């Protein structure tokens, strides 16, 4: 059931918010809501396994299947870490059987280095870390080593992507021919969202090549050139030249295409503060610049906070995305880790802004893209803009996790049960509007009755992210739960796969 907050009440909440560090630590216990999320996961898995396995994703309306991720069973690999956390040994064993049989050297599709890294490589590495660590004994230990073996096999297949004059990789590659799509640039997020996975693989295998490849590419982003494409400290352009590693533009945002570069800067410091102090420094610079230069408040709702974009003409763009709503969680993680209350407070403001995009629609689910530019409000959305401070550019919902993700971080950092309720409301609405007889479908328009029709696709990140963060919010305390301060023993990749933080041998 959707919770409706009056605008005055929301403003009052923002004004009277208790400082994060004054709130008691979350009390962890078994919760029937965790069981409800487990049921949703099993429902989605059963539909996928019965109608689409071993293909990449289920079409949950027609009960067909898709192979958008190399034909290697993306949903199965992406589901592994969540199934482990839920301690569902049956599903974990089904996935281990599948992974052992995959030949990562064979596909007829062009392969995305980025998507393959964050879903397949990360899913297997995370499964290994969990089953060799806090979930040891869930399945026969002799079955676990294949995860690391297959991770290394996959990395060996993919690593030629880095064979460029600069070391900045191609993203779209042909693993059969050893070719690529001929691109001259790579995206900021694509280039900057490989280092956690490839470094972890090196640390587990003792082969430092994987870390060197990813960190060489990242180094161009940590020392960006030319200076004009870093208009504010830490905030850099959204594309990188493959030939020389120089930035190709000065388009600044936390939106898709740039987002997870910033996400990984602070997460690399969580992973190993000894090696990745520069990553922390660059994240701090970006965070401070974002507060000073990108923070934006709709004219009709000055209590709401979003992050704007910035272009080469020195203009702010008042458009954001569901993808961008990870930003609150990033500020919260960095703020609690570095004992920066200003980052925590700003993160909570961003979380509240993204909550508004959920709380204000007919379905209680947020849109793919939204804006708060007062000069572009469609006549049909003037009431929404006046009431909520945003209007919708793209009303689709394709089972994205970022809003729930940031709610989860807010709960873990503050201990304030409000954020648990926000997670529950979001999960309940997804379960209501997206659930089909065999899984979960996307929505055409979150601000139309019944979601404006359904999209016949169940993305693998429904398993990896939406259901994981929903479950973790209500699950008992465990090693993999996000912690306040510097107490994290796991750090999550951008697909919500937890890696064990580095500990020197």
From Swiss-Prot:
Disulphides: 325-354
Keywords for the protein's UniProt record, in alphabetical order: Carbohydrate metabolism, Cytoplasmic vesicle, Disulfide bond, Glycoprotein, Glycosidase, Hydrolase, Metal-binding, Signal
Residues reported to bind Ca(2+): 494
Pathway: Protein modification; protein glycosylation
Principal EC category: hydrolase
Pfam families reported in the protein's UniProt record: Glyco_hydro_47 (PF01532)
GO molecular function, one term: mannosyl-oligosaccharide 1,2-alpha-mannosidase activity
One GO CC term, this protein: endoplasmic reticulum
Gene Ontology biological-process entries: carbohydrate metabolic process; ERAD pathway; protein glycosylation
Active site per database record: 368
InterPro entries membership: 6hp_glycosidase-like_sf, Glyco_hydro_47, Glycosyl_Hydrolase_47, Seven-hairpin_glycosidases
Entry EC number(s): 3.2.1.113
Reactions catalysed according to its record: N(4)-(alpha-D-Man-(1->2)-alpha-D-Man-(1->2)-alpha-D-Man-(1->3)-[alpha-D-Man-(1->2)-alpha-D-Man-(1->3)-[alpha-D-Man-(1->2)-alpha-D-Man-(1->6)]-alpha-D-Man-(1->6)]-beta-D-Man-(1->4)-beta-D-GlcNAc-(1->4)-beta-D-GlcNAc)-L-asparaginyl-[protein] (N-glucan mannose isomer 9A1,2,3B1,2,3) + 4 H2O = N(4)-(alpha-D-Man-(1->3)-[alpha-D-Man-(1->3)-[alpha-D-Man-(1->6)]-alpha-D-Man-(1->6)]-beta-D-Man-(1->4)-beta-D-GlcNAc-(1->4)-beta-D-GlcNAc)-L-asparaginyl-[protein] (N-glucan mannose isomer 5A1,2) + 4 beta-D-mannose; N(4)-(alpha-D-Man-(1->2)-alpha-D-Man-(1->2)-alpha-D-Man-(1->3)-[alpha-D-Man-(1->3)-[alpha-D-Man-(1->2)-alpha-D-Man-(1->6)]-alpha-D-Man-(1->6)]-beta-D-Man-(1->4)-beta-D-GlcNAc-(1->4)-beta-D-GlcNAc)-L-asparaginyl-[protein] (N-glucan mannose isomer 8A1,2,3B1,3) + 3 H2O = N(4)-(alpha-D-Man-(1->3)-[alpha-D-Man-(1->3)-[alpha-D-Man-(1->6)]-alpha-D-Man-(1->6)]-beta-D-Man-(1->4)-beta-D-GlcNAc-(1->4)-beta-D-GlcNAc)-L-asparaginyl-[protein] (N-glucan mannose isomer 5A1,2) + 3 beta-D-mannose
Co-factor note (free text): Ca(2+). Can also use Mg(2+), but with lower efficiency.
Gene3D superfamilies documented for this protein: 1.50.10.10
Domain of life: Eukaryota
Family stated for the protein in its record: Belongs to the glycosyl hydrolase 47 family.
General function of this protein: Involved in the maturation of Asn-linked oligosaccharides. Progressively trims alpha-1,2-linked mannose residues from Man(9)GlcNAc(2) to produce Man(5)GlcNAc(2).
Subunit field text: Monomer.
Protein's recorded name: Mannosyl-oligosaccharide alpha-1,2-mannosidase 1B
Classification lineage: Eukaryota, Fungi, Dikarya, Ascomycota, Pezizomycotina
